[in-house]
C-alpha cells in the first residue's frame, strides 16, 4: 500500500492520519467530518487524503517483460 506521506502542495505530514481516515470513512462516517476531527483544515491536504486511490494491488497483477 502506497499512501501519501505529505501533502503534495504544502508539505504537511499526513501519513499518520490516512489509516484512521480510511477506517472511519469505511465505517460510514462523512469524510468531511472525519477530516475536521483529525484537524485537516487546508483544502490541499483534504484533497490529498480524499483523492488517494490504492492501485498497488491492481498493478501487481501485471507481469514485467524483459
From Swiss-Prot:
<keyword id="KW-0240">DNA-directed RNA polymerase</keyword>
<feature type="binding site">
    <location>
        <position position="44"/>
    </location>
    <ligand>
        <name>Zn(2+)</name>
    </ligand>
</feature>
<comment type="function">
    <text>DNA-dependent RNA polymerase (RNAP) catalyzes the transcription of DNA into RNA using the four ribonucleoside triphosphates as substrates.</text>
</comment>
<comment type="similarity">
    <text>Belongs to the archaeal Rpo10/eukaryotic RPB10 RNA polymerase subunit family.</text>
</comment>
<keyword id="KW-0963">Cytoplasm</keyword>
<dbReference type="GO" id="GO:0003677">
    <property type="term" value="F:DNA binding"/>
</dbReference>
<dbReference type="InterPro" id="IPR020789">
    <property type="entry name" value="RNA_pol_suN_Zn-BS"/>
</dbReference>
<dbReference type="Pfam" id="PF01194">
    <property type="entry name" value="RNA_pol_N"/>
</dbReference>
<dbReference type="InterPro" id="IPR023580">
    <property type="entry name" value="RNA_pol_su_RPB10"/>
</dbReference>
<keyword id="KW-0479">Metal-binding</keyword>
<feature type="binding site">
    <location>
        <position position="45"/>
    </location>
    <ligand>
        <name>Zn(2+)</name>
    </ligand>
</feature>
<comment type="subunit">
    <text>Part of the RNA polymerase complex.</text>
</comment>
<protein>
    <recommendedName>
        <fullName>DNA-directed RNA polymerase subunit Rpo10</fullName>
        <ecNumber>2.7.7.6</ecNumber>
    </recommendedName>
</protein>
<dbReference type="GO" id="GO:0000428">
    <property type="term" value="C:DNA-directed RNA polymerase complex"/>
</dbReference>
<keyword id="KW-0862">Zinc</keyword>
<dbReference type="GO" id="GO:0008270">
    <property type="term" value="F:zinc ion binding"/>
</dbReference>
<feature type="binding site">
    <location>
        <position position="10"/>
    </location>
    <ligand>
        <name>Zn(2+)</name>
    </ligand>
</feature>
<keyword id="KW-0548">Nucleotidyltransferase</keyword>
<keyword id="KW-0804">Transcription</keyword>
<dbReference type="InterPro" id="IPR000268">
    <property type="entry name" value="RPABC5/Rpb10"/>
</dbReference>
<dbReference type="GO" id="GO:0006351">
    <property type="term" value="P:DNA-templated transcription"/>
</dbReference>
<dbReference type="GO" id="GO:0005737">
    <property type="term" value="C:cytoplasm"/>
</dbReference>
<dbReference type="GO" id="GO:0003899">
    <property type="term" value="F:DNA-directed RNA polymerase activity"/>
</dbReference>
<keyword id="KW-0808">Transferase</keyword>
<feature type="binding site">
    <location>
        <position position="7"/>
    </location>
    <ligand>
        <name>Zn(2+)</name>
    </ligand>
</feature>
Amino acid at each position: 500500500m502506497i499512501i501519501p506521506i505529505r501533502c503534495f502542495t504544502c508539505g504537511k505530514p499526513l501519513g499518520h492520519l490516512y489509516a484512521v481516515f480510511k477506517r472511519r470513512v469505511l465505517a460510514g462516517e462523512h469524510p468531511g467530518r472525519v477530516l475536521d476531527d483529525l484537524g485537516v483544515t487546508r483544502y490541499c491536504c483534504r484533497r490529498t487524503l480524499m483523492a488517494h486511490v490504492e492501485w498497488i494491488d491492481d498493478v501487481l497483477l501485471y507481469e514485467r517483460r524483459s
